[in-house]
């Protein structure tokens, strides 16, 4: 049976959630798998996550640049994110996804990842110091309750990075 709450408690909770949403302080992040690493992306920085469409290879590019893909009439540069990070590239499969960078960055870029892991809220996780000197686009690093390390991506810094 559903738990009963008073109208006053319901209204107070609803008002708090609306206030948090209006102020942009919602903490849910999109979680993706990139190789062996878990990455978090702010929802305001992610355009959308889609199954991998056909990718047309481009010659004479870096190994992590997979090519270009047409998504609803828009061309996106497809970057194999785990390979960009220095690891093995994505083995394309049913779980593979393209994370489209938000339109406001005008980057026309999509990150190829091993899979989407849904939404996560890192508010209760322990912040940690990165094991090595972080890139400018590594916003933060966390450890969750299970001991898994999560890295938060700063998309604005990533698209400004000269290596990207």
Labelled PLM ranges:
Residues 1-164:
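An acidic, low-aromatic, low-complexity terminal/linker signal
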């Amino acid at each position: 049976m559903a738990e009963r709450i008073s109208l006053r408690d319901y209204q107070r909770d609803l008002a708090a959630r609306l206030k948090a949403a209006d102020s942009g302080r919602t903490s849910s992040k999109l979680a993706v798998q990139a190789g062996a690493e878990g990455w978090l992306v702010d929802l305001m920085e992610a355009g959308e996550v889609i199954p991998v469409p056909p990718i047309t290879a481009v010659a004479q590019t870096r190994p992590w640049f997979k090519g270009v893909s047409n998504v609803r009439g828009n061309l996106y540069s497809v970057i194999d994110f785990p390979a960009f990070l220095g690891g093995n590239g994505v083995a394309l499969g049913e779980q593979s996804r393209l994370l489209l960078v938000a339109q406001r960055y005008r980057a026309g870029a999509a990150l190829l990842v091993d899979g989407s892991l849904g939404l996560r809220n890192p508010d209760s996780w322990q912040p940690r110091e990165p094991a090595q000197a972080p890139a400018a686009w590594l916003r933060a690093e966390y450890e969750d309750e299970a001991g898994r390390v999560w890295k938060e991506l700063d998309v604005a810094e990533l698209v400004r990075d000269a290596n990207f």
